[in-house]
Amino acid sequence: SLILNGKQLASIISAEIAQQTAVLAIKPRLAIILVGNNLASEIYIRNKISCAKSLNIETQLIRLPSTATKNNILEIIKSLNEDPTINGIIVQAPLPNKNFQETVFEAIDPRKDVDGFTPANIGRLCNGNRNCLVACTPLGIWKLLSYYNISLSGKHVVILGRSRIVGRPLSILLSQKFEGCNATVTVCNSQTKHLAEIINLFFVLV
C-alpha cells in the first residue's frame, strides 16, 4: 500500500500562490467570522491567519460573542458580501447555536464561499459543474491524487465518514467525470455493517 504525503505538494502550491499574489497591486482579503470562545476554533483561526499572511493574503477577523443572534451574524455577512474589497468569507464552525448554522452558511455569497458550504457551490458540484468552490480537504485530496498520477477511473474508493466538510463532498467529487475521478465510491458511517469486509475491497481508502 502507498501512503500519500501532502506536505511536498502543499509547499509547491503555497509557493505558486505567494508568487502570484506578490505582484498584485491590491492584495486579496479574507474575512473570518468567529462566534464564541471555542478553543479548537481559536487554533484553527490562528493557523488560517498565519497561512494567509505567508501567501500575501490580508485577513479581517470579526469576533462575536457566543450570544450573537442569527440576525447579528447575517447583517455582518450581508455587509461583507457587498464589500468589493473582501474576496473571501469564512464563518468558523461550529457556531455556539447550531439551530441557525445552515442559514448562516447559506447567506454567504457563493463567489466568496471559501469553505464551499453554500447550496450553490454544493449543487454545482453535484451537477458536475467545475465552476464552483469545493471544500478544501476534498479538493486537496483530488490534487494530491493528481500529483501522484493516480487515476481513480473504474476503481473502488472507500470513504470513512460522511461529514459536510470531507466525506460528503469528497464522495461527490470523486464520482464525477472529472480528470482522474470516475470512481465507484462507498461512503461508510458509524452505522455501517461489516466495515472490515468493505475496507478489504478498496483501491483507495480515505
State what each model feature region is.
Residues 52-66, 181-188:
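Short beta-strand elements in bilobed, periplasmic/extracellular small-molecule ligand-binding domains
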Residues 2, 54, 81, 108-111, ...:
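Non-catalytic terminal and connector segments of soluble metabolic enzymes
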Residues 1-26:
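Positively charged, low-complexity intrinsically disordered leader regions
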Residues 82-87, 201-204:
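Short acidic/histidine-rich motifs immediately flanking catalytic phosphotransfer sites
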Residues 27-37:
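Short beta-strand segments enriched in small/hydrophobic residues
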Residues 35-49, 129-206:
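Glycine-rich phosphate/diphosphate-binding loop of Rossmann-like nucleotide-binding domains
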Residues 72-84:
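Short, well-structured alpha-helical segments in soluble
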